[in-house]
């Protein structure tokens, strides 16, 4: 016996709701706790290190500058290619015996402070100092409390242990090694964010109008896979409970935010590769379910007879052939993405699955009125702010940012967001938005669309166009805040909630309809509606 379609959709929605409890934000590379003293107040720069071995151009490494020393040029054409020499002693903690005149000094980390190494290399005539870290990460090189004044006039930067070992090996083999150091800047605005904005707004719009656009005719209603079926009672006509929907209650909204916070803390303390793998499997199941429902719905809208042929299978019983074929297709796509999820192009499949899952969730989970919407969105509003800005005071770092970065062992993160490559950024990376930043406002906007439709409101007197504008504006303000704050993590709901819920409340007050929005679906039907009198 197979599970009912709604049960499958409800399970997928539940998995998705746990995923959206984790809202991803950006992070920066500034250390605001490091002491600021004369000569030690630089911002950390990411550096491209191009190398040549015996005249042959090799792999380009990534490095990071120190909080002291001179800044590197951002333009490659202004950088100068210089030879590299190992320091003697290799740790650069005492006077150097090697000749470094107009050369880049290559040293190793340890035994003394970064500032001591920099001063020793500069005294030895080095044009720059490259430190080899003792691990595959780039640590921030800051000044110590005893460094009351520094006068380091050469660039100081750090490379990973694997990059440093490759350079050191070539030098020890008496090969000529040359480096070109420059620090290209990321653009203030990456135009790829426009596509992310369109994907987010488009997802909310499609999810809102989906039931209306794909509403089946009476003779083919049985083949509808995604659009919820209206019940015949009075509450259904008033936006109340429907057969295949899950109405979120006020208590449920509070419990969800508390559960999401608990889950976030568990991820923070127990983040591991197997934990991420389990959540990725949940994501794949939810995305596959959403893709299946969307495709079946679209096909049966165009060809109502396509879903009429059934096939009797063991354990499953009567199954639509169309549904089975689409399910197999979605399963193959899901497996292909899962196997290639760590490749550079995996973002496209992740976005497709994410959008399908969110559209599916917004058809199942619904807000009954503005009262519940206010409770849910206000809780999510403070939840987002707390875990981004206040949690560092308790956990020594932002829990939200730490979870968003994923596992340090594998570098893999939870696929809980839409992302698109930063096309104009020399450092690559991704523009991202968390599922919660789409689904939380999306729940409100979907309710508003139903309210407008059931009350015969148009563009001029409706709420839906205003909320779509508000959501788009909120996203714009989110990215504007991100760029103004130089990439510092921004809780998106800080902007999205006022631009959606705030607009709803203001319009409701102006139009004197706030009471109707607040109590929508809770009014008791009149006796005449329940027991209509017979006609005379």
Curated annotation (Swiss-Prot):
Residues 30-186, 265-273, 340-344, 396-428, 485-489 are lumenal. Its main location: membrane. Residues 94-170 form the PA domain. A motif (PAL) lies at residues 491-493. The chain crosses the membrane at residues 187-207, 244-264, 274-296, 319-339, 345-365, 375-395, 429-449, 464-484, 490-510. GO terms for molecular function: aspartic endopeptidase activity, intramembrane cleaving. GO terms for cellular component: endosome membrane. Intramembrane-cleaving aspartic protease (I-CLiP) that cleaves type II membrane signal peptides in the hydrophobic plane of the membrane. This is Signal peptide peptidase-like 5. It comes from Arabidopsis thaliana (Mouse-ear cress).
């Amino acid at each position: 016996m197979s599970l009912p379609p709604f049960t499958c959709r409800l399970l997928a929605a539940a998995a998705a709701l746990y995923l959206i409890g984790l809202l991803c934000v950006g992070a920066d590379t500034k250390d605001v706790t490091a002491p600021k003293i004369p000569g030690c107040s630089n911002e950390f720069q990411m550096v491209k290190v191009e190398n040549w071995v015996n005249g042959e151009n090799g792999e380009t490494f990534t490095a990071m500058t120190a909080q002291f020393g001179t800044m590197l040029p951002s333009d490659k054409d202004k950088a100068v290619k210089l030879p590299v020499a190992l320091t003697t002693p290799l740790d650069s903690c005492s006077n150097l015996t090697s000749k470094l005149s107009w050369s880049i000094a290559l040293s190793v980390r340890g035994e003394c402070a970064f500032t001591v190494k920099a001063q020793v290399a500069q005294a030895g005539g080095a044009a720059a100092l490259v430190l080899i870290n003792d691990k595959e990460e780039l640590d921030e090189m800051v000044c110590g409390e005893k460094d009351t004044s520094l006068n380091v006039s050469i660039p100081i930067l750090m490379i990973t242990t694997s990059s440093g070992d490759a350079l050191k090996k070539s030098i020890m083999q008496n090969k000529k090694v040359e480096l070109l150091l420059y620090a290209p800047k990321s653009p203030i605005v990456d135009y790829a964010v426009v596509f992310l904005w369109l994907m987010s707004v488009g997802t909310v719009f499609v999810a809102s109008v989906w039931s209306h656009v794909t509403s089946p005719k009476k003779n083919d209603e049985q083949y509808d896979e995604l659009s919820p079926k209206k019940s015949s009672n009075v509450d259904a006509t008033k936006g109340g409970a429907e057969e295949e929907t899950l109405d979120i209650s006020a208590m449920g909204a509070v419990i969800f935010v508390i559960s999401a916070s608990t889950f976030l803390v568990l991820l923070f303390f127990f983040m591991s590769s197997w934990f991420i793998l389990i959540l990725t499997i949940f994501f794949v199941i939810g995305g596959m379910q959403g893709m299946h429902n969307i495709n079946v719905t679209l096909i049966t809208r165009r060809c109502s007879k396509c879903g009429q042929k059934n096939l009797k299978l063991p354990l499953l019983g009567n199954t639509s052939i169309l549904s089975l074929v689409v399910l197999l297709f979605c399963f193959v796509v899901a497996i292909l993405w899962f196997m290639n999820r760590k490749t550079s192009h995996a973002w496209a499949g992740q976005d497709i699955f994410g959008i399908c899952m969110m559209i599916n969730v917004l058809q199942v989970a619904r807000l009954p009125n503005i009262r519940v919407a206010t409770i849910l969105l206000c809780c999510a509003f403070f939840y987002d702010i707390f875990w981004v800005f206040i949690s560092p005071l308790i956990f020594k770092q932002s829990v939200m940012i730490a979870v968003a970065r994923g596992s340090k062992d594998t570098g893999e993160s939870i696929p809980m967001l839409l992302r698109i490559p930063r096309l104009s950024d020399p450092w690559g990376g991704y523009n991202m938005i968390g599922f919660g930043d789409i689904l939380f406002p999306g729940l409100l906007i979907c309710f508003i669309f139903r309210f407008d439709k059931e009350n015969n409101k148009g563009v001029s007197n409706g709420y839906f166009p205003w909320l779509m504008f508000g959501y788009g504006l909120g996203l714009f303000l989110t990215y504007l805040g991100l760029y103004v704050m130089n990439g510092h993590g921004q809780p998106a709901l800080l902007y999205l909630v006022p631009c959606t819920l705030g607009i709803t409340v203001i319009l409701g007050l102006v139009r004197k309809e706030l009471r109707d929005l607040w109590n929508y679906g809770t009014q008791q039907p009149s006796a005449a509606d329940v027991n209509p009198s017979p006609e005379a």
